[in-house]
Design a protein with these regions (language model features):
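Short, charged alpha-helical interaction segments and adjacent helix-coil junctions
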Residues: 2-7, 80-85, 181-284
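Low-complexity, glycine/alanine/valine/leucine- and proline-rich hydrophobic stretches
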Residues: 148-155, 178, 182-187
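Short intrinsically disordered coil segments
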Residues: 137-144, 177-183, 227-229
Length: 284
């Protein structure tokens, strides 16, 4: 693994990095390999993809739009929305479902139609874990479909959501077995690597490490990447600030609630997780 002070390869969690590796015609073999690794047991092999317009407008003026990181169609007509989710956000699942409707609605032709739909897949690469320990600590790949809640039978198999909880993936280089393992390792660790791991000698990774090496970029590409990296850092800084502010506000509310209950400053401090001095400043 790399010295954290250096960076040889781009960070795929940045907008520039993700689209450089997966969102260009030149690198579509990387996207094909990644998607095949996700569905090797449940879907026939993808041999080609065609990139589609990643920006979608609503049906009428003023309707909300959706902008996907990567949107493509496979050789068998299936549509894939691939999203890199930097941080947890409210109503993430609702947003994911909403985005999938664009890939469904655009299939409706003008004129007569029998309602036949091609498969729609939404792939979410999550740089966070689902809240409240929703899934076991060792389960980081989730494949979701519409199912009967009584017998778990698949009711509709043409709408699929795959979510990857990246922070849960902790396999070392020596533990990588499947192509899925290798792609997860790359996504999790690429920007921290100084050398190509011996476990990643498959031909497709020749292309990946070539395209990910910052030293080979033009001056313009380097500037674009640095700007994208700055946006990535700013985003996390803003999120951390918001969380600290929310936590502080929660403690203040706790202080006044405990005060109304008649507790002493010492008891309030213990209950709110603050010092006695901080409590006294708040309650006067």
């Amino acid at each position: 693994m790399a010295d954290e002070r250096k960076e040889r390869y781009i960070n795929p969690y940045t907008d520039f990095g993700f689209k450089k590796l997966f969102g260009t015609e030149m690198n579509k073999e990387l996207l094909i390999s990644f998607l095949n690794s996700l569905f090797c047991e449940t879907k026939k092999e993808i041999t080609d993809v065609r990139y589609l317009n990643s920006e979608h407008l609503g049906d009428g003026y003023g309707d909300r739009r959706a902008v996907f990181d990567v949107y493509c169609m496979t050789d068998d007509g299936g549509r894939f929305i691939v999203e890199m989710q930097k941080a947890e956000q409210d109503y993430f699942k609702d947003r994911s479902l909403y985005y999938s409707t664009f890939a469904i609605r655009e299939q409706a032709p003008k004129g007569e139609w029998d309602y036949h739909l091609d498969d729609v897949y939404t792939v979410g690469i999550l740089n966070f874990m689902f809240p409240d320990n929703e899934y076991p600590a060792d389960k980081y790949r989730h494949e979701i479909q519409l199912k009967d809640t009584e017998d778990n039978h698949v009711f509709y198999d043409k709408l699929t959501f795959v979510y990857l909880e990246m922070p849960k993936f902790n396999l070392t280089e020596d533990e990588l077995v499947t192509m899925f393992d290798k792609w997860m390792f790359v996504l999790r660790n690429l920007s921290r690597l100084l050398d190509r791991p011996k476990a990643l000698q498959d031909r497709v990774f020749d292309k990946l490490f070539e395209q990910a090496e910052i030293a080979k970029y033009s001056d313009a590409e380097r500037r674009q990447y640095e700007e994208s990296k700055k946006d990535y850092w700013d985003y996390f800084s803003t999120m951390k600030t918001a969380k600290r502010k929310a936590k502080k506000e929660e403690k203040v509310e706790t202080v006044f609630r405990l005060k109304e209950m008649g507790l002493t400053p010492e008891q309030i401090a213990q209950g709110a997780g603050l010092s006695i001095e901080e409590v006294k400043k708040l309650i006067g």
